[in-house]
Curated annotation (Swiss-Prot):
Source domain of life: Bacteria
GO terms (BP aspect): ribosomal small subunit assembly; translation
Identification of the protein by name: Ribosome maturation factor RimP
Function: Required for maturation of 30S ribosomal subunits.
Keywords: Cytoplasm, Ribosome biogenesis
Keyword Cytoplasm: yes
InterPro entries to which the protein is assigned, alphabetical: Ribosome_maturation_RimP (IPR003728), RimP_C (IPR028998), RimP_N (IPR028989), RimP_N_sf (IPR035956)
Source organism of this protein record: Corynebacterium glutamicum (strain R)
Length: 178
């Protein structure tokens, strides 16, 4: 039996991730003999902490071991298991990514033009998101259709955001766009 593929491992991991209320955000399998690795990225609306990731990692290890004993998986000479969250440099590609980063700054790269905005609420259908941009002293509110979203990555912010921006980011989609 060959080293397991991402498809096979995803089918095993996803039910366990769901039981922890995690979304499987990434899975990378690197086959390199005794230095093989399985890197798993999970996230949730409540942001997993280190203790939760440790428990999840142990359960995945047990799941893989049991599947190997049954002959369903073969990791060969062994592997390293890495479990983490995606991190801030992960592009925002799904509505849940935007929802989880509400209130944070996002860098949007559209047609070679970069703009920075604060993420507001999503509409009920999760097809559009509010973006808040500061133009001198005024706040400008626009909406972005997620289906046509440019590359978007959370910006690290060291200063506390202005109160008016925070309040607008916390308002509902309808309130912000009224």
């Amino acid at each position: 039996m060959a080293f397991p593929t991402t498809e096979i491992l995803s089918a095993l991991i996803e039910p366990l991730a769901a039981s922890h209320k995690f979304d499987l955000e990434g899975l990378k399998v690197t086959k390199a003999g005794p230095k093989s690795a399985v890197a798993i990225k999970v996230d949730s609306d409540s942001r997993p902490d280190l203790d939760q990731l440790e428990v999840f990692s142990q359960e995945i290890g047990e799941l893989f071991d049991a599947a190997e004993q049954r002959g369903e998986l073969n990791f060969g000479a062994g592997y390293t298991l890495e479990v983490s969250t995606p991190g801030v440099d992960n592009p925002l590609t799904l509505p849940r990514h935007w929802r989880r980063n509400r209130g944070r700054l996002v860098a949007l790269d559209q047609d070679g033009r970069k703009r920075v905005a604060r993420i507001g609420a999503l509409n009920d259908a999760e097809t559009h998101v509010v973006l808040i941009e500061r133009n001198k002293k005024l706040l400008e509110v626009t909406t972005l259709e997620l289906a046509h979203s440019p590359r978007a990555v959370v910006e690290i912010e060291f200063a506390k955001p202005a109160q008016d921006e925070t309040a607008l980011a916390e308002s509902t989609f309808d309130e912000a766009t009224a």
